[in-house]
């Protein structure tokens, strides 16, 4: 349990699990805002009574406890954090309503099917679809030569796509197929490096080496299901 919590009426607690990219996304958002909090690591095979009490519908992490009141689901939590601490740190969501809507569009990017596809025509089709989707992201970054999708600092789209920066290289290693290269996606490739070097991610870096065996097992499970 990490002792990163706010004193007094704004005491904040986060229930999470080390391997979850959704939990990492919330931790990065809290870091952007400079929010101190208590972190509670959950065993998802033996969920605590506190987690079940605070998220009785989905019974999963992350759950943020703020002034004794729970907020569940990572996307909801990130927006809550941005609004609850609007006076601190950088803005996560754009102020402009249209830009805010466009940022929300990328909350769940559909690029992961290629990891679950078996070698052969199915994998080739999934890779082709992933390349098309990544090209859209490449073009978004290339316009104006932006450092991040939000501009000069990490924002909602960067947090939503952040798992790509460390999961895609792991997928490539496991499958043996290169997807994001400097030649094919120069802006996106550079963004992945910048994102991993950004302050919120360096505060809570993804545990890549610990994750690799987990993703290899997931890949095998997907293939065996086919």
Predicted regions and their residues:
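Alpha-helical scaffold segments in carbohydrate-active enzymes
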Residues: 105, 133-136, 160-167, 187-197
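C-terminal helix/juxtamembrane-tail motif
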Residues: 209-226
């Amino acid at each position: 349990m990490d002792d990163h919590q706010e004193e007094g009426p704004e005491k904040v607690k986060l229930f999470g699990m080390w391997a979850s990219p959704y939990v990492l996304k919330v931790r990065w958002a809290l870091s952007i805002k400079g929010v101190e909090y208590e972190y509670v690591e959950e065993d998802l095979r033996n969920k605590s009574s506190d987690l079940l009490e605070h998220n009785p519908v989905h019974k999963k992490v992350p759950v943020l406890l703020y002034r004794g009141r729970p907020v569940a689901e990572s996307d909801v939590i990130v927006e809550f954090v941005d609004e609850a601490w609007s006076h601190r740190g950088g803005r996560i969501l754009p102020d402009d309503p249209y830009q805010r809507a466009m940022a929300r569009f990328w909350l769940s990017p559909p690029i992961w099917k290629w990891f679950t596809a078996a070698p052969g025509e199915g994998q080739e089709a999934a890779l082709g679809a992933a390349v098309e989707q990544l090209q859209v992201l490449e073009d978004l970054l290339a316009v104006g030569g932006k450092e991040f999708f939000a501009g000069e600092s990490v924002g909602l789209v960067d947090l939503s796509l952040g798992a790509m920066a460390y999961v895609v290289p792991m997928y490539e290693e496991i499958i043996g197929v290169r997807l994001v290269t400097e030649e094919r996606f120069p802006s996106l490739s550079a963004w992945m490096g910048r994102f991993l070097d950004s302050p919120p991610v360096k505060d809570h870096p993804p545990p890549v080496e610990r994750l690799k065996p987990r993703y290899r097992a997931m890949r095998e499970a997907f293939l065996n299901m086919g």
